[in-house]
């Protein structure tokens, strides 16, 4: 019996695969536990349509990620922060992922999730700082920050 796997089944198949399995195994285990469904013409058509829409969405995300990367790597894209500085040359407050994401949105209209900004430790120094950011899967870039004394 041909089935479409709805979830990964160790040793049998991965989600989205169409495979031939013994009829009893399919009916009594895979289908009952919602791990697979019978591969009818309609079900196969739905699977193909779903895979095409996922590929299209993935391609759109890659294109959007590359556009954001180009914006971030432009020479004029430098996120400016004006912070109060103590006598030791360190800022009173620290600059976090959240602050960087908000300023990027406010100053340049570039929306990046704060969880994708990869700051090792909160920034407390004054000057030019490069912060790595993971835009989408394997698309990475650098945000240029300028922290000024205010």
Swiss-Prot record:
GO BP: translation
Record flagged with keyword Ribonucleoprotein: yes
Alphabetized UniProt keyword annotations: Ribonucleoprotein, Ribosomal protein, RNA-binding, rRNA-binding
InterPro entries, sorted: Ribosomal_bL9, Ribosomal_bL9/RNase_H1_N, Ribosomal_bL9_bac/chp, Ribosomal_bL9_C, Ribosomal_bL9_C_sf, Ribosomal_bL9_N, Ribosomal_bL9_N_sf
GO molecular function, one term: structural constituent of ribosome
Gene Ontology annotations for the cellular component aspect, listed alphabetically: ribonucleoprotein complex; ribosome
Pfam family, one: Ribosomal_L9_N
SUPFAM superfamilies, alphabetized: L9 N-domain-like (SSF55658), Ribosomal protein L9 C-domain (SSF55653)
Superkingdom assignment: Bacteria
Primary role: Binds to the 23S rRNA.
Family to which the UniProt record says this protein belongs: Belongs to the bacterial ribosomal protein bL9 family.
Protein name per UniProt: Large ribosomal subunit protein bL9
